[in-house]
């Protein structure tokens, strides 16, 4: 095939030396560059950096609570740490890959756990009075969870245990946020948008998880296909752990948008915000009065709003 070349036969000693990480993924090391151990697994972390940057910027621009700025910054650290880990396969950078995943996820976990406790208080006055106390109690619990999981990862050095417990924490966030949406969002149109956004955020995670497991359990098969039929550079497209990065990076962004809108509907002032679908399919929360700049719809794949006419209407009002 034109513009293709075979994989090297012998293992290559790269710039970073022998791997010291507890995990070495299916992607063969240093086959594309002597400076990057796992090429595809490294560069696909760009998706975390891009979505985290936009999520942070959007939270700041829309004057959302600080928690959402911290969530965006947290997931940018995940992208940086994962980049360094897959580039070097050194243990010290492995810690910067998986531990920031925990620390970034703890923030939305704390937020949704506190929201759930607050919303169970029916009296509005008591709810406001108890809000700070509830958030502080949940904060201490979250700190305890972080400490235990960090100890498991660093001292016990059992990534599988860490990953299972982290998965349970993430699942709790999904279940509780779904419960809040179903029982405590009463606007049917908003609820529909919420559930669609929630599902759109979850589907990439599920597909990505399948890719991750296939990469682990059928590694020799993928290596055979890459070496025998694809060669380089096409082989880099069949690195399933890299697809895990792309899919979860997208899913994280969408799910954070879902959590933002859920928070506004249950604890904020929804009249100050507009939930839009850029180009009819990409969800985003926008504070009213701010320019949107692209075509959008108010429901998934719904009628496209003419932004020029919409902007003129806002000016006249």
Swiss-Prot record:
User: What is this enzyme's EC?
Assistant: 3.5.1.-
Listed disulfide bonds for this chain? 26-219
Of the GO CC terms on this record, one is: endoplasmic reticulum
Q: Which residues span the membrane?
A: 99-121, 134-156, 240-262
Q: Which residues lie within the membrane without crossing it?
A: 36-56, 68-88, 161-181, 196-216
The source's superkingdom equals Eukaryota
Offer an example of a GO molecular function term for this protein: N-acylsphingosine amidohydrolase activity
Magnesium as a keyword? no
Question: What does the record give as the reaction this protein catalyses?
Answer: N-hexanoyl-sphinganine + H2O = hexanoate + sphinganine; sphinganine + hexadecanoate = N-hexadecanoylsphinganine + H2O; an N-acylsphinganine + H2O = sphinganine + a fatty acid
What is its biological role?
A: Acyl-CoA-independent ceramide synthase that catalyzes the conversion of dihydroceramide and also phytoceramide to dihydrosphingosine or phytosphingosine. Prefers dihydroceramide. Very low reverse hydrolysis activity, catalyzing synthesis of dihydroceramide from fatty acid and dihydrosphingosine. Is not responsible for the breakdown of unsaturated ceramide. May play a role in heat stress response.
Name of the protein in question: Alkaline ceramidase YDC1
Species for this entry: Saccharomyces cerevisiae (strain ATCC 204508 / S288c) (Baker's yeast)
């Amino acid at each position: 095939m034109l513009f293709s070349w075979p994989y090297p036969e012998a293992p290559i000693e790269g710039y970073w030396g022998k791997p010291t990480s507890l995990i070495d993924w299916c992607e063969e090391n240093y086959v594309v560059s002597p400076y990057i151990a796992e090429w595809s697994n490294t560069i696909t972390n760009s998706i975390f950096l891009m979505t985290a940057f936009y999520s942070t910027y959007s939270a700041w621009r829309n004057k959302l609570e600080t928690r959402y700025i911290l969530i965006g910054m947290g997931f940018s650290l995940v992208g940086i740490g994962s980049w360094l880990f897959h580039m070097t396969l050194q243990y010290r950078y492995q810690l910067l890959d998986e531990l920031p995943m925990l620390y970034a996820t703890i923030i939305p976990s704390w937020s949704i756990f506190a929201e759930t406790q607050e919303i169970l208080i029916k009296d509005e006055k008591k709810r406001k009075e108890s809000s700070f106390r509830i958030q502080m109690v949940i904060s201490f619990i979250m700190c305890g969870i972080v400490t235990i999981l960090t100890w498991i990862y660093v001292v016990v050095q059992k990534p599988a245990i860490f990953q299972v417990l982290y998965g349970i924490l993430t699942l709790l966030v999904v279940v509780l946020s779904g419960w809040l949406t179903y029982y405590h969002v009463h606007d049917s149109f908003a609820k529909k948008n919420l559930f669609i956004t929630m599902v759109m955020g979850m589907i990439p995670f599920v597909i990505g998880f399948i890719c991750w497991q296939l990469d682990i359990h059928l590694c020799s098969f993928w290596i055979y296909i890459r070496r025998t039929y694809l060669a380089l550079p096409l082989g880099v497209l069949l690195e399933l752990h890299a697809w895990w990065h792309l899919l979860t990076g997208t899913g994280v962004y969408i799910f954070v948008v879902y959590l933002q809108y859920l928070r506004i509907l249950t604890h904020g002032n929804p009249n100050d915000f507009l939930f839009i679908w850029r180009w009819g399919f990409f969800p985003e929360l926008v504070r009213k009065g701010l320019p949107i700049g692209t075509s959008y719809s108010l429901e998934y794949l719904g009628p496209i709003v003419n932004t020029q006419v919409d902007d003129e209407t806002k000016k006249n009002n």
